[in-house]
């Protein structure tokens, strides 16, 4: 059983409830407020360690590979950043609901000493970014048998 919390399903404040005043406030506050980008700006990234590597995965649906950057800075800090552009709006369009997020995101991860930062690989497939950072092999101590005389 995993102790890692994967979602906010049990958070009563994250539920999508009907609000009778929602339409009143939507007419005053435009649908493209800063809250619309909050979910994307705080992109969630999984980091798992295998015996051979550190693997980072991020769900980035609708993001093109040209809109994502993966870098290593300061020697051991992995930086994953990107941007999802807003959909072009027509002045005649009337939005009923805006749930897909847009905007920029940036996440930084300090890599452990065993990370081979010169061999980092990244791929974007089916909306999932996977960054693999190989680990340095742990050197086994050399044991030399000493012959006992006598």
From Swiss-Prot:
Subcellular localization(s) per the UniProt record: Cytoplasm
Q: Where is this region: Important for thermostability under elevated temperature?
A: 1-42
Write down what this protein is called: 16.9 kDa class I heat shock protein 1
Question: Could you name the Gene Ontology cellular component terms for this entry?
Answer: cytoplasm
A single GO molecular function term of this UniProt record: unfolded protein binding
InterPro entries hit by this protein = A-crystallin/Hsp20_dom (IPR002068), HSP20-like_chaperone (IPR008978), Small_HSP (IPR031107)
Per the record, the GO terms for biological process are:
protein complex oligomerization; protein folding; response to heat; response to hydrogen peroxide; response to salt stress
Oligomer and partners: Forms oligomeric structures.
| Ranges where the sHSP domain occurs | 36-150
Q: What induces it?
A: By heat shock.
Q: Which family, according to UniProt?
A: Belongs to the small heat shock protein (HSP20) family.
**What are the record keywords, sorted?**
Cytoplasm, Stress response
The answer to whether UniProt assigns keyword Cytoplasm to this entry is: yes
Question: CDD domains given for it?
Answer: ACD_ScHsp26_like
């Amino acid at each position: 059983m995993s102790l890692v919390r994967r979602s906010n399903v049990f958070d009563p404040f994250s539920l999508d409830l009907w609000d009778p005043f929602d339409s009143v406030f939507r007419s005053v506050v435009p649908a493209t407020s800063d809250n619309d980008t909050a979910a994307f700006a705080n992109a969630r990234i999984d980091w798992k360690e295998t015996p051979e590597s550190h693997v980072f995965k991020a769900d980035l649906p609708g993001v093109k590979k040209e809109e994502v950057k993966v870098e290593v800075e300061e020697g051991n800090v992995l930086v994953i950043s990107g941007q999802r552009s807003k959909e072009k709006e027509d002045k005649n369009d009337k939005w009923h609901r805006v749930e897909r997020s847009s905007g920029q995101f940036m996440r930084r991860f300090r890599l452990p000493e065993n990370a081979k930062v010169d061999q980092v690989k990244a791929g974007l497939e089916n909306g999932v970014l996977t960054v693999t950072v190989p680990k340095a092999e742990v050197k086994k101590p050399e044991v030399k048998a000493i012959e006992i005389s006598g």
